[in-house]
Regions:
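Conserved ABC transporter NBD signature motif
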Residues: 60-68
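Helix-to-loop junction immediately C-terminal to a conserved catalytic motif
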Residues: 52
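Non-catalytic connector elements of ABC transporters
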Residues: 239, 249-354
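ABC ATPase nucleotide-binding domains
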Residues: 33, 72-231
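The feature captures the beta-strand-to-loop junction immediately N-terminal to the Walker
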Residues: 37-39
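Conserved coupling/switch loops of ABC nucleotide-binding domains, chiefly the family-specific signature
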Residues: 58-61, 111, 211, 243
Length: 354
């Protein structure tokens, strides 16, 4: 197997008596785009800052391209970083901001001008060279910050929640642009975010973090469809959680309220009488009994919300509530609160949370 480009090995970080990152391990392949996803305070930015050299690990080591960089200063690591707050120099033009690192490195004026022009073309802002940061929108400023980070041709690109200060439409277009540029340059990238949609849409892999540890590392498909822990299942995507009791472990029978479903092969050592947390994504559930769905539960519609192209329906099943979306059809009246209703699903889509 090829050697990883970035290897974070058993890294721990403590501030006094408080440990914020605990035994964090991750290997990143050359050219890979990996997102650190998690809530505030989970340690994702601290790990990024240790890779950048702004924080020193309390234990463990960080290796880039086979070289131990754990104790190197930030300017010795050949790492580009983009901050949430842009951090552009207000007294410098766009071209001067992009070329700043090149000038510090002692590059010749003609080379700087050529590289700056190339960067402006890459971020599609060639006409902005002589403007100042205050004359730019937030999205344009973040593009300039990205261009400045990649202008020196770093080995590794680090992005610390670069889109969180932007409005929704700009965030979507800019994240796609960042991914496109990253693919074009082939630069190994770590992207920190608390936004699951961002992470799912642009990452090769995602490290979901909680309490200073990596709860799960996997592709977006794996993280969403095969969550390893209850935290990952709840944090990524919308989830319906049902409490059930194992009635027959050998045959995989579980009782939800007073109704039974079969989860053969999914109980993982659970015994008859055990209580389980079961979960279904809304898109895995249909209203009414549907062909091809091997499981169903009966309940009563408790809420109906018209959302335009879809109608969000909540169905009470004993002490559980299940949320699902059904397409809006002008020819079919929406379901009504208080109606009895069946929901159907495939048992293969049911998650057992641990």
């Amino acid at each position: 197997m090829a050697e990883p480009f970035l290897s974070i090995q058993h890294v721990r970080k403590s501030f006094g008596a408080t440990t914020v990152v605990e035994d964090f391990n991750l290997d990143v392949e050359p050219g890979e785009f990996v997102s650190f996803l998690g809530p505030s305070g989970c340690g994702k930015t601290t790990v990024l800052r240790m890779v950048a050299g702004f924080e020193e690990p309390s234990a463990g080591k960080i290796v880039v391209a086979g070289k131990d960089i754990t104790r190197l200063k930030p300017n010795q690591r050949n790492v580009g970083m983009v901050f949430q707050a842009y951090a552009l120099f207000p007294n410098l033009t766009v071209a001067q901001n992009i070329g700043f690192g090149l000038k510090v490195a002692g590059m010749a004026r003609a080379e700087i001008d050529s590289r700056v022009a190339e960067m402006l073309d890459i971020i599609k802002l060639p006409q902005m060279a002589d403007r100042y940061p205050y004359q730019l929108s937030g999205g344009q400023q973040q593009r300039i910050a990205l261009a400045r980070a990649i202008a020196p041709k770093p080995k590794l690109l680090l992005l610390d929640e670069p889109l969180s200060a932007l409005d929704a439409k700009v965030r979507v277009s800019l994240r796609e642009e960042i991914r496109s540029i990253q693919k074009k340059l082939g630069i190994t990238t770590i992207f920190v975010t608390h936004d699951q949609e961002e992470a799912l849409s642009i990452s090769d892999r995602i490290a979901v973090m909680y309490g200073g540890k990596a709860e799960q590392v996997g592709t977006p498909f794996e993280i969403y469809n095969r969550p390893a822990t209850k935290f990952v299942a709840n944090f990524v995507g919308t989830l319906n959680v049902l409490e059930g009791t194992v009635t027959d472990a050998a045959s995989g029978k579980v009782r939800v309220n007073t109704q039974e479903v079969s989860l053969m092969g999914k109980l993982n050592g659970s015994k008859s009488g055990d209580t389980l947390s079961l979960a279904l994504r809304p898109e895995a559930i249909s209203l009414g009994r549907q062909p091809g769905r091997d499981s169903s539960l009966s309940g009563e519609i408790s809420e109906v919300h018209f959302l335009g192209s879809v109608i969000r329906v909540r169905v009470g099943i004993g002490g559980n509530t299940v949320s699902l979306d059904t397409f809006n059809s002008p020819a079919t009246p929406p379901p009504a609160v208080g109606e009895k209703a069946d929901i159907s699903f495939s048992s293969s889509d049911m998650l057992v949370l641990h």
